[in-house]
Amino acid sequence: YQWILAAGRGAGSLGESTRTDLQLFNGAATDSTVTIGFRVARLADGSPAAQVPTATLTVPAGKVVSLPDVVKGLFGLDAAVGSMDVVSDPPVFAFARVTAADSGGGRHGYGSAALLGDSTAAPGSRAVFIQATDAGWDVMESELQLTNPTDGAAQVTVKAFDTEGAAVGSPLALAVGPKDVVRVPTAYYAVAGTGAPIGRLEVVPAEGSQAVFAALLRQDKKTGDADAVVPYIVPS
């Protein structure tokens, strides 16, 4: 199993022209059978999205298969944000490019390489983002996305800190159901209650919770440029 975080089409931080192009590389000596699922994200106060059917394809030995606009092409979705899970035998390497149309021509966006299960935050550890930024709707914004890859429930608390390491605002408790994806737009502001050019966010799974993936999407609201940040996992 591997997971692509922060994929989307026609919605999300990059706007209505967002699309995701996926590439799959099979370095093995035999063909690989690949099954891809898309987990539609919801807002923290929203209901879990309906499950989308998976898609299965073959990646020939030693070849790359490119899937442009994969969220629409494979899953028929016009407007959705979420995560993709990739199951393959033998294993493939997956990489996505998430882009949107640029007013000056071309496209801007970010790359998202597939992650393995050891990149999750589990109970006793925490996922730390030292690059959280919410500096105004027209300057910089950061969106937090949490993915539960398991069949059990997850419960996490999101905490905010200033540049001096002092806790700010009120911790945000979030329930992330089985195979669920939750979005928190302007995440630092949502927790801290105020914006900041530089801040820190921590995602802390509760005792007994399932492990979760976390990703932070930071976007320059003037240029449209963005990056998808994975956290530093502080072990227990």
Where are these regions (language model features)?
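Gly/Pro-rich, tryptophan- and cysteine-flecked surface segments typical
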Residues: Y1-S236
